Swiss-Prot record:
Binding site for NADPH: 14-15, 35, 109, 142, 258, 282, 284
Top enzyme category: oxidoreductase
Protein name, UniProt field: Glycerol-3-phosphate dehydrogenase [NAD(P)+]
GO terms assigned for molecular function: glycerol-3-phosphate dehydrogenase [NAD(P)+] activity; NAD binding
Active site: 194
PANTHER family, per the entry: GLYCEROL-3-PHOSPHATE DEHYDROGENASE, GLYCEROL-3-PHOSPHATE DEHYDROGENASE [NAD(+)] 2, CHLOROPLASTIC
Annotated organism of origin: Shewanella denitrificans (strain OS217 / ATCC BAA-1090 / DSM 15013)
The EC number(s) this enzyme carries: 1.1.1.94
Cellular component aspect of the GO annotation: cytosol
Pathway of action: Membrane lipid metabolism; glycerophospholipid metabolism
Source domain of life: Bacteria
Length: 339
């Protein structure tokens, strides 16, 4: 491949690599950047990412790059797929290297650590208002996407024409269906809150509560997500779509989810540190819980499930005690604006 690409993907973890593979499998010239030169050389030599996606070969039109400047110069379309806690730092590094015609889309799920700000606010702070922004989200396990299994996601952005171009670029009749959405805020929020609820669902299963309890957590978790989203100006309908209910069900019910497995370990009696070590990869929901809790408190939004998970992760409460407290709360109408 020469030094041009239709899209550059920043982040060579499991999800970034999977999206790069999907794009390249569509015949799009795709460039994948990672911050560690040695690791990227291994990817280039092996034509695979054996650490995260063992056995899946890179398409011919997927190139590897460890130089951020070269990666950003190669394409105007930049897809950021890094953990939420380094999202701002990566954009800060990228800013002086971006092309004037760059457009930024991210698949990072989460909020800004400590502040609970949406990533759109972080992006604008780091980049200013001169670049079109977009986000993609939905129920996706990286290995299934990379393997070409059918998947569906949603895309929303600040510029309708950019959103439309992303739908065309990402969509594949064989592997990936992409829906346009005009709710930029709502699409971002779902990816953070679902990680929190997935930890709760995992804890419930780890304790041994069964399918009834898991389903109740998912359902009431969706209520909490919707309530928080509406408080931020999002459209309630967004949360019954791919980036809301879709991502929530996937993450809460399948053991490919690191957040669910982390919660299961806690429910079985592991402490937080041991549970994280068992997973062996970033558990985004751990940070997301604090971020969502902080945001909800700031907005005055009642999120009882999120609050109990926060107390387990950050205040040492036993998962079984958190469950008891949720069950013993005052009786409410199911359709009440407060749970």
């Amino acid at each position: 491949m020469n030094n041009t690409a239709e899209i550059t993907v920043l982040g060579a973890g499991s999800y970034g690599t999977a999206l790069a593979i999907s794009l390249a499998s569509n015949g799009h010239k795709t460039l994948l950047w990672g911050h560690d030169p040695n690791s990227m050389q291994v990817l280039a030599d092996s034509r695979s990412n054996e650490r995260f996606l063992a056995g899946i070969r890179f398409p011919d039109c997927l190139a590897i790059e460890a130089d951020l400047g070269k990666a950003l110069a190669a394409s105007k379309n930049i897809l950021v797929v890094v953990p939420s806690h380094v999202f701002g730092d990566v954009l800060k590094q990228a800013k002086p290297l971006l092309r004037k015609d760059s457009r930024i889309v991210w698949a990072t799920k989460g909020l800004e650590p400590e502040t609970g700000r949406l990533l759109q606010d972080v992006a604008r702070e780091q980049l200013g208002d001169g670049y079109p922004l977009a986000v993609l989200s939905g129920p996706t396990f990286a290995k299934e996407l990379a393997a070409g299994m059918p998947t569906a996601i949603s895309v929303a952005g600040t510029c309708p024409s950019f959103t439309h171009e992303l739908v065309e670029l990402l969509h594949s009749p064989k592997r990936l269906r992409v829906y346009a959405n005009d709710d930029f805020t709502g699409i971002q929020l779902g990816g953070a809150v679902k990680n929190v609820i997935a930890i709760g669902a995992g804890m419930s299963d780890g304790i041994g509560f069964g399918a009834n309890a898991r389903t109740a957590l998912i359902t009431r978790g969706l209520v909490e997500l919707t309530r928080l989203g509406v408080a931020l100006g999002a459209n309630a309908e967004t949360f019954i779509g791919m980036a809301g209910l879709g991502d929530l069900v996937l993450t809460c019910t399948d053991n490919q989810s690191r957040n669910r497995r982390f919660g299961m370990a806690l429910g079985k009696g592991c402490d937080v540190i041991t549970a994280q070590e068992e997973i062996g990869q970033v558990v985004e929901g751990y940070r997301n819980t604090k971020e969502v809790y902080t945001l909800a408190k700031r907005l005055g939004v009642e999120m009882p499930i999120t609050e109990q998970i926060y107390q387990v992760l950050y205040q040492g409460k036993a998962p079984v005690d958190a469950a008891k407290e949720l069950l013993s709360r005052d009786k409410k109408s199911e359709t009440s604006k407060k749970s």
